[in-house]
A protein has these predicted regions:
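Glycine-rich, charge-decorated loop segments at or immediately adjacent to ligand/cofactor-binding or catalytic sites
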Residues: 70-75, 145-167
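Short internal beta-strands
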Residues: 59-67, 147
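Glycine/threonine-rich flexible loop motifs
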Residues: 118-130
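Single conserved hydrophobic/aromatic residue that forms the stacking wall/gate
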Residues: 1-10
Length: 227
């Protein structure tokens, strides 16, 4: 009925990374890598800091275009380093074959945690990096845990589907320009449709948002790219 639908609108959305009781047990005793950047905030703290405070063994960070703290320019080569605040090593996403992490990097961890804000556009590069990491995790038998976030453009779908002969670093899947999905939904679709190279399937767990529908308005608390 209309009144309960209206009240749902006012329920606060609970993001995947806020649901620590759902995913802390999954991470116990594991060597953890995270794929995140400056948008991976749980309230006013970064996911990395929360995991370290709770004595989890975070061994590596993968960071996308713009760098882990979000301060590099688009397309600028972000070299491997360490996160100055925590000392956790930042590994290159591209030091292996096919623009994927190297085998040495993949052997460092047991589970990859993804927490990053996407905007639901085909040419936005974060989902492409996610797919490459899913592919590497499938190849090396690593688990993936995705902490989902709302899509600020999740209320509509628009534009043609990519002709895969034009697959590139700014368009990687046969999806419309505005695809309407959260990263978690997209990751599940990638697995379900066997879109990874060689039809690989990744061992994937998604912690979905609570109180989120595709009609729910979501205002980004932090700009997803610095430019």
């Amino acid at each position: 009925d209309r009144s309960s639908a209206a009240s749902d609108v006012y329920k606060r959305q609970v993001l995947g990374d806020e649901q620590t009781s759902e995913y802390f047990p999954i991470l116990k005793g594991k060597r953890i890598a995270i794929f995140s950047n400056h948008t991976g905030m749980v309230g006013d703290k970064h996911l990395l800091d929360i995991l370290l405070e709770n004595k989890f063994n975070v061994v590596a960070i993968f960071s996308p275009e713009h760098g882990f703290r979000g301060d590099a320019d688009a397309g600028e080569h972000v070299s491997s380093s360490v996160d100055k605040k925590t000392g956790v090593p930042i590994l290159s996403l591209y030091d292996g074959k096919d623009k994927k992490p190297s085998e040495a990097s993949m052997r460092k961890f047991d589970i990859l945690v993804i927490d990053i804000q996407d905007v639901g556009l085909r040419f936005y590069t974060y989902y492409i990096t996610m797919c490459r990491l899913m592919d590497a995790c499938a190849e090396y038998n690593r688990k993936v845990l995705l902490l989902d976030r709302p899509n600020p453009n999740g209320h509509y779908v628009d534009g043609p589907i990519l002709d895969m002969k034009y697959k590139s670093g700014v368009g990687w899947l046969p999806i419309p320009i505005v695809h309407g999905m959260t990263l978690g939904e997209l990751a599940l679709m990638v697995n379900g449709e066997r879109w990874l190279p060689a039809s690989r399937v990744c061992d994937l767990t998604v912690i979905p948002c609570k109180n989120y529908t595709h009609q729910t308005k979501y205002t980004l608390p932090i700009p997803p790219s610095p430019n």
